[in-house]
Amino acid sequence: VTITSGTPAVLGFTPDRRQEAGKQFVDVGIAEEHAVALASGIAANGGKPVYGVYSTFIQRSYDQLSQDLCINNNPAVLLVFWGTLSGMNDVTHLCFFDIPLISNIPNMVYLAPTCKEEYLAMLEWSIHQNEHPVAIRVPATDVISCGEPVESDYSNLNRYKVAHRGSKVAILALGSFFGLGQSVLSLLKEKANIDATLINPRYITGVDSELMDELKADHELVITLEDGVLDGGFGEKIARYYGATDMKVLNYGAKKEFVDRYDIQELLRANHLTDEQIVDCLLYTSPSPRDISGS
């Protein structure tokens, strides 16, 4: 059953498609709370609900996410659209607070695909599994297709994917910011001959402790990139994990603030989220260039 809350176009449900779907499609109106409660109830009774919602509106349903869905561990699927700094830019419709909101509720599995193929594979898995409520942060902006094989089973939770194995610096590039991670990887090689490790975390809700421990052997610096607010976000989980170790961790994301009618390029620069700014920060702040380049 497909569910929307006043925004059927978020899932491409035109009037013709809604007519064709019949009772398999439900729009509850501007009532996100009811949509999540409905999805939870359907899942509890063996159905396969998929609720599509814009990031900016999911905040209205926090009580139902926690009390109805996650406490009961009902395997409904939530598709969170436009969870990105590049989404709607007026102060009442900001789209970058969903990671702290959703990912810190117990039992929830929040996934961050990096491309079309990964998104569709995660969606297929989430519909057929029966163990967890699953939310998927649908890739936004210029994320289209990777053209590479992706995994089909995500049951082994919190296992990150190493996209490129290097040393000294590890880049954890979450979801829509994976492309930024690729740019940082290339620029580090070009500017300082540093062959960094690039990681696709995939899971927003947990830490791959085995991989994080492996990095200690030949890495001095871990950076996280997330297309959202830093406070309560993904990067803080990684920083906390390494808190009692010698590993240096730098988190890149947006400052916790209300911004209105902003220019996205200006916002990215203000938060040091361009590849040039990130690489300059890595090379000219602690640890020193000598530490991470070995020169």
Identify the function of each model-found stretch.
Residues 284-295:
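Single conserved hydrophobic/aromatic residue that forms the stacking wall/gate
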